[in-house]
Amino acid sequence: MKDSTRKLKKLLSQKEIKDRVEAMGKKISVQYSNSNPIFIGVLNGSFIFMADLLRSVTIDCEVDFIKVRSYSGKKSSGTIKLLKDISCDIRGRDVIIVEDIIDTGLSIKFLYERIMGAHPKSVAVATLLHKPGKAKLDFSVDFIGFEIPHKFVVGYGLDFNQKMRHLDEIYYIPDGSDI
């Protein structure tokens, strides 16, 4: 580990992540066995999770990406900015939004409403990480990898100021850390 990562505390191992993502892929494959869903990955954080999840599904599917920003450092800005929209037509299609983490719920609520506005057949949400009790959502999160404590996490695509996405396990930054 580099100096900036020495203060991190491991939350989830590579094996725990791999096993859970594979289980999520199997569950999605069963639920969508008669469909050709469109997986919409939320950039940048979900790209590693999305790739592993897609390798775990056994159904035909399509892929697109959307990019929003709501964080600056370790704090949510409270506003969502759309940086890249989807490019495919989702009208009448089953859509699965693939998110890295649901924390405040602002991003996923914005995305869910935006996707619903394009008149898909259905919209499901798959998230690797979920901080329960914090997000106030008026829809269900269909596929949850892990429920985690209210800590700031990095690794496996999740970042702190665009750094530490490359870590193959998920770590949390201890409270009071000067990272």
Named regions from a protein language model:
Residues 1-179:
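PRPP-associated nucleotide enzymes
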